[in-house]
Amino acid sequence: MSSGAPQKSSPMASGAEETPGFLDTLLQDFPALLNPEDPLPWKAPGTVLSQEEVEGELAELAMGFLGSRKAPPPLAAALAHEAVSQLLQTDLSEFRKLPREEEEEEEDDDEEEKAPVTLLDAQSLAQSFFNRLWEVAGQWQKQVPLAARASQRQWLVSIHAIRNTRRKMEDRHVSLPSFNQLFGLSDPVNRAYFAVFDGHGGVDAARYAAVHVHTNAARQPELPTDPEGALREAFRRTDQMFLRKAKRERLQSGTTGVCALIAGATLHVAWLGDSQVILVQQGQVVKLMEPHRPERQDEKARIEALGGFVSHMDCWRVNGTLAVSRAIGDVFQKPYVSGEADAASRALTGSEDYLLLACDGFFDVVPHQEVVGLVQSHLTRQQGSGLRVAEELVAAARERGSHDNITVMVVFLRDPQELLEGGNQGEGDPQAEGRRQDLPSSLPEPETQAPPRS
């Protein structure tokens, strides 16, 4: 899972590493439980956590640590799940700090917001968690559970992210092929999750979303029967959780986001703001979504009905500030900047080439239809290797004048070598645009084409 600092494009670990060998090495390097004065092997998630944040933050802690040690993804996810589950079944009161009332900047009628908040010490909680992880690893040395050894589809995912000319990098991304193992889901539907979050006003909201959206999705009872609804609820709940954190810690950041959940033979996408995902099928772009922007007629009407306004400065902005109309966070712009995501689904037939998820730093300057040619030319030059294609796409965005943070993720649904051998069926075809599959008619068209955002 790649929700920490941005990383260069990389393939998914093959999982071919010997699981018992990994456990042996791990326990050789960490032969004893941690003492209170010992340093943590991986950075703790902040200073305090609310109880609703514990599962996601500890899972992220484990996946970051195990990923740094090249653990096979199914093993890393299963280990993380078992250790988190065991710790959550214990009494966490020993980690409790004195409860305090959330400080309200303005009067709020929501009783939940006014209730005392139980906060836990993140450092001591992380130490206890690592000791639990060592214990589970020791137990599994004798007998590794089937879930940790189960074969799964090997995904080729190319990821590249750059700060560009901005002072700070505020994007985050997630690549989680072992979704089921991380959350202990035992139904027969294989799931993989991918996401890009584009932060603004700081990285806190983007990092938070990269940790908690998929955790909240996995905990929705309707995930097996209504994945779209589960993803929408996951965004909504993550927004509520972050707003509580933002009020406690006086954070002002926000983030747009887009995610793709591949569940068996169905693709589910959800989005908030202007980060986007497209599908390429047999060389043709399939538009899956319409980004949320202030100039969209329905978004403008929603904002004005709430008492806000949309104005054009260097670009269209909500209340003269934000260039997005929906986002997680942005505590001082709620409810005008909505935390309600949209979602859509599509059956996969096996003829799909790849998914591309990216932030507006890419899509504001690279039209959808140019993506196919850029990917195909890269595959041609690299003799069918798609490993570094995201770097090529990021470079193309920079050449076209993007100054924003740029994150691009390409999830191949077929072997790139097959795409090279099959050629780019849409390139140079005057009827390609007519054959392009467009977004569902239930989604509104934008009022105007949005200019690049600075």
Curated annotation (Swiss-Prot):
GO terms for molecular function: calmodulin-dependent protein phosphatase activity; metal ion binding; protein serine/threonine phosphatase activity; protein tyrosine/serine/threonine phosphatase activity. It is an enzyme of class 3 (hydrolase). GO terms for cellular component: cytosol; nucleus; perinuclear region of cytoplasm; protein-containing complex. The modification Phosphoserine is found at residue 454. Changing residue 296 to Q: In a colorectal cancer sample; somatic mutation. It catalyses: O-phospho-L-seryl-[protein] + H2O = L-seryl-[protein] + phosphate; O-phospho-L-threonyl-[protein] + H2O = L-threonyl-[protein] + phosphate. SUPFAM superfamilies: PP2C-like. Residues 1-28, 419-454 are annotated as: Disordered. Changing residue 302 to C: Found in a patient with sclerosing cholangitis short stature hypothyroidism and abnormal tongue pigmentation; uncertain significance. InterPro entries: PP2C, PP2C_BS, PPM-type-like_dom_sf, PPM-type_phosphatase-like_dom. Its cofactor is Mg(2+); Mn(2+). This is Protein phosphatase 1F. It comes from Homo sapiens. The gene is PPM1F.
